[in-house]
Amino acid sequence: MELPANVQNQLMQFQQLQQQLQMIMYQKQQFETQLKEMEKAIEEMEKSDSEEVFKMAGGILVKRNKAEVKEELSEKIETLQLRVTTFEKQEEKMQKRYTELQESLQKVMGQGQ
C-alpha cells in the first residue's frame, strides 16, 4: 500500500522530531551531570578547612584560592542551570509536538486499514 505524500511527510517529520528529542534529552543529561559534579565539588570544598584548593588546568593541578574557585564554580552552576532550564523547555515543546504527530499518524494509519 502506497502512503499518501502528506502521510509520508508526517512520518518523516515524526522521525526527525524523534531524533531531535533524543538529542535534546542527551544534551540536557550531559549538563545535569556537569551540574551535579560542580555542586559536589563545592560541597567537598566546604568540608575543607584550607583556604587553598587544587584546580585542574590543562592537565595539571594548580593551587588556587578556595573562595575564587568557589565563585567560579557558582557562576558555572548558574550558567548550567539556565541551560538545563532551556533544554527542559525545548524538550517539553518537542514532546508535545511529538505526541500530536504520533496521534495524527495513528489516526491516518487506522483509517487506511
From Swiss-Prot:
Keyword terms of this UniProt record: Chaperone, Cytoplasm
Pfam families, alphabetized: Prefoldin_2
A GO biological process held by the record: chaperone-mediated protein complex assembly
Compartment annotation: Cytoplasm
GO molecular function: protein-folding chaperone binding; unfolded protein binding
Gene Ontology CC terms, in alphabetical order: cytoplasm; prefoldin complex
Family annotation (Gene3D superfamilies): 1.10.287.370
Main localization, broad class: cytoplasm
SUPFAM superfamilies given in the database record: Prefoldin (SSF46579)
Record bears the keyword Chaperone: yes
Its biological purpose: Molecular chaperone capable of stabilizing a range of proteins. Seems to fulfill an ATP-independent, HSP70-like function in archaeal de novo protein folding.
Subunit record text: Heterohexamer of two alpha and four beta subunits.
Family: Belongs to the prefoldin subunit beta family.
Protein name per Swiss-Prot or TrEMBL: Prefoldin subunit beta
Species, as recorded: Methanococcus maripaludis (strain DSM 14266 / JCM 13030 / NBRC 101832 / S2 / LL)
